[in-house]
From Swiss-Prot:
Protein name listed in UniProt: Putative sodium-coupled neutral amino acid transporter 11
Gene Ontology cellular component annotations, sorted alphabetically: membrane
Transmembrane segments: 22-42, 52-72, 94-114, 143-163, 165-185, 200-220, 246-266, 286-306, 324-344, 346-366, 389-409
Disulfide-linked positions: none
Species in which this protein is naturally found: Danio rerio (Zebrafish)
Length: 448
């Protein structure tokens, strides 16, 4: 394996690099990982049980880290520089078509979810502005989505060099800490006021496989791995491993704290979009919504870069797009995602479906399968054993996840105020006695 490593390192040492430093590439990678999926992680804890959910999150993070490096190693072994070309070199045209469809669908659906979040989140922020009532145009999700597209996501998506998004990604990371602070503070102040059910703290639940799908959606970044790898000033395996470890490690730390704090606050009442749990009159939650809405807008262009690259590889054989082709393809992608997000607003189902159909194959199955086929060792020996286990786990999660999704579909409670919000009309949360009194009254009424 030492000789193989030397070959891998030398294969790109002489290759043409980009303009990104390790820190800039890490910012872009972390921004790609911590996208819309993080908002559903508290709900995944509700599906799996908090202890089991955290264990599964760490396991999925390990698989993410390991398979990202496998992906680039496979690319170096085969002499390819994109996910699609790697799969074509190992599994032929059929494999190329399948992975192209998946690699297109994942970021495309992710962009739809980003628009849904921006529309749902920022409208609630604008409602808190004095003088902005329910009939105001700023409270219309269609208007907010359209304006955020025209003013922000479209101009940023028109960049040709992903390295130019480094500063925007840094801004997104700063905003992410604002979101994290909101959830953690409310776990301490609001959590004790919402009584948990008897099974709120069980070790594990049967819906754990569905939780893995949501976690996979939250942590996947394989679809733009080659793009960020190629943007490094010196694209070597050692530098790429450092970027991967920093990015995945930082992301899973933020994700674990976010998931645990969010679930601890609302337990069995946790929604697919955690911000749907907070009352509209909560000023701190409004700050968190603002941070998340802006963060999502800055993440959108990264996914557009990937979608555009997939189209370029499929239609133009990977050649560099002309300026006019670049603009036209970008406009088509943005228009399509915007049109769909304007007509559909149920986020939870979008996250879970994208996790099972796109994220799991791209994260678990294809990186392991490509590396195993390119490796000369047996599947049951050395590091190939880990790749084999990841491959089997991916197939299992995908099949069982689809079955569980059909048997236990998510409810879409978009825009509904939670019952405990009626107990207080102030921007700060109500006293515990008021909340508990309201909940007990509601429960007694339902029993009668």
């Amino acid at each position: 394996m030492e000789s193989e490593r030397s070959c891998l390192l030398s294969s790109h040492d002489a290759g043409k690099g980009g303009s990104s430093s390790v820190s800039s590439a890490s910012f872009n990678f972390i921004n790609s990982i911590i996208g819309s999926g993080i908002i559903g992680l508290p709900y995944s804890m509700s599906q799996a049980g908090l202890p089991m959910g955290l264990l599964l999150l760490i396991l999925v993070a390990f698989i993410t880290d390991y398979s990202i490096i496998l992906l680039v190693r496979g690319g170096n072994l085969s002499g390819t520089h994109s996910y699609q070309s790697l799969v074509r070199s190992t599994f032929g045209q059929i494999g190329y078509i399948i992975v192209s469809v998946l690699q297109f669908l994942y970021p495309f659906i992710a962009m739809i979810s980003y628009n849904i979040i921006a529309g749902d989140t920022l409208t609630k922020v604008f409602m808190r502005i004095p003088g902005v009532g329910p009939g105001n145009i700023l409270t219309e999700r269609h208007f907010v989505i359209a304006m955020s597209t025209v003013l922000f996501t479209l101009p940023l998506s028109l960049y040709r060099d992903i390295a130019k998004l480094g500063k925007v990604s840094l801004l997104s990371m700063i905003l992410t800490f604002g979101i994290l602070m909101t959830v953690v503070v409310r776990a301490a102040t609001l959590g004790p006021q919402i009584p948990a059910s008897d099974d709120a703290w069980v070790f594990a639940r049967w819906n754990a496989i569905q939780a893995v799908a949501v976690m996979s959606f939250a942590l996947i970044c394989h679809h733009n791995s080659f793009m960020i790898y190629g943007s490094l000033q010196e694209p070597t395996l050692s530098r790429w491993s450092l970027v991967t470890h920093i990015s995945v490690g930082s992301s899973v730390l933020v994700s674990a704290v976010f998931a645990a704090a969010g679930y601890a606050t609302f337990t069995v009442y946790t929604q697919g979009d955690i911000f749907e749990n907070y009352c509209r009159s909560d000023n701190l939650a409004t700050f968190g919504r603002f941070c998340y809405g802006v963060s999502i807008i800055t993440t959108f262009p990264l996914e557009c870069f990937v979608t555009r690259e997939v189209i370029s590889n499929a239609l133009f054989k990977g050649g560099e797009l002309s300026k006019s082709s670049h603009v036209i393809i970008t406009l088509v992608i943005i228009s399509a995602t915007t049109a769909i997000s304007l007509s559909y607003d149920c986020l939870g189902i979008v996250l879970e479906l994208n996790g099972i159909l796109s994220a799991v194959p791209l994260m678990f199955i294809f990186p392991s399968a490509c590396f195993l086929k390119l490796s000369n060792e047996r599947w049951c020996r050395g590091e190939n054993l880990i790749a084999s286990m990841i491959l089997v786990a991916g197939v299992f999660v995908m099949i069982i996840g689809l079955i569980m999704m059909a048997l236990f579909p998510q409810d879409c409670s978009h825009g509904a105020e939670m019952f405990y919000c009626s107990a207080s009309n102030t921007s700060s949360t109500a006293s515990p006695s008021n909340i508990l009194q309201f909940i007990n009254t509601t429960q007694n009424t339902s029993i009668v």
